[in-house]
Amino acid sequence: TNVREYLKSYDVGPINKLSYTKHHESHAAYGYYGTNSGNTRWAIVVLDSIGEFETYTIWDGLGGRIKRIHSQGYPHSIGLWYSAMTQRLGLVANKDEYLVAQMAKQGNAERYKKDVDELFDINYPSVKFNVNMHRGLDAWLPDADANDLAAAVQSKFEEIIMGISLWLKNVHHYEQVCFMGGCALNKPAIDNVINSRMFQHVHVPKHPGDPGSCLGSVFAKTKTRVDFSDKIWYNSTTDGKGK
């Protein structure tokens, strides 16, 4: 769709110039400028399936600016792997990922741990794969118990998030981290980082996936911090209607 024609349908008035922001930059900007960042240093970890070409980036946020310090591209995608495993478990990819963590509670992660480990080539911060996830994994371990496989997948994902976090803490000495992209919606993995107490602050904003990227695109250009206090952004009258 032509962007100018699309915007005209909303009667936004004359459009003199269009400015574009890269997908992962918009994620990172939303995370950084949507925090009470001030002059403190933040690590922003962006993980999704495919953000144009990038699938996993790490950004340094300091002094009102963000700078990419690590980038990994397709086909090495943690998010795409999790979606492929979602489909392998008989669920709908890009929709039912949250059910994997629920199934994992009923399973034994150790049963297929070795099989899952063999898919990966990890040397943090690099997390790469020995297979192309875009081809799917529908025929992988065809006789595996679904709950046990879900447990192994969720356990590996949590291990990766913790591994990235430890690298940020031990190598770069970050005290604050923000997780962005669809993978940031994996609550058990983020809770593990919070409960480890290795960081002073762990931040995941509302809508860390693609819905938040519209705001991130603006923040990437304006480089202005926005106060996302619930009192300001979610203030409602007693009848439930926003003011």
What label would you give each PLM region?
Residues 2-34, 54-56:
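Active-site neighborhood for divalent-cation/phosphate handling
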Residues 13-16, 38-43, 53-56, 174-175, ...:
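Short coil/turn connectors at secondary-structure junctions
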Residues 19-44, 195, 216-220:
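Conserved phosphate-binding catalytic cores of ATP/NTP-utilizing and phosphoryl-transfer enzymes
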Residues 22-28, 52, 184-186, 209-211:
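Short acidic loop-to-helix transition motifs that present clustered carboxylates
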Residues 137-164:
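Adenine-nucleotide phosphate-binding core of ATP-dependent small-molecule kinases
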Residues 159-240:
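Catalytic phosphate/nucleotide-handling subdomain of diverse soluble enzymes
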